[in-house]
């Protein structure tokens, strides 16, 4: 959003209140889009990150309306062909309230050759355990896999996400491939390591598997562990 060359193309879309995702900072920095501006005093007006609606706002905050949010995403994701304007829509949602609720619209996005990013936040079975099974997502990737032009990833660390996003932008906006990305993320608080120095790391991330660390090479017993998302940290 700080890059003036790319920020006008970005379309951040959020259902619900966005605070679970730690994205409330957007409210004051770039504002929530409202075609008539703000007509009320928000409940949290005394807070630094209170709701701020503007005619020039950029965040599409659709409330508890996943179908509406996904429809907005499809509109932006197909603007390249309908309006000859390339946009970068990024729809961030509770991963249990994504494909499980709007799978038909996700399929329609594939049919429409949409280009953009879907971020299934709060993914994994440990992220929001206090709220019960409604946020215990361990299967949204199975549903996403039924859409042929949906590219899916379940990263754990920041460098993985950066590599995936860069490749997504290259494929969709440089190579003009008709694909869209579904990426699951977590809201757990943990430290992120540096990207491994191995020259094959970036290629491995994009292929879906890369080496993070070696176990003791002098031991006779060799264990190979494969994991992603929330469970990867426990495996390490």
Stretches found by the model and what they are:
Residues 170, 200-236:
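Long hydrophobic segments that form regular secondary structure
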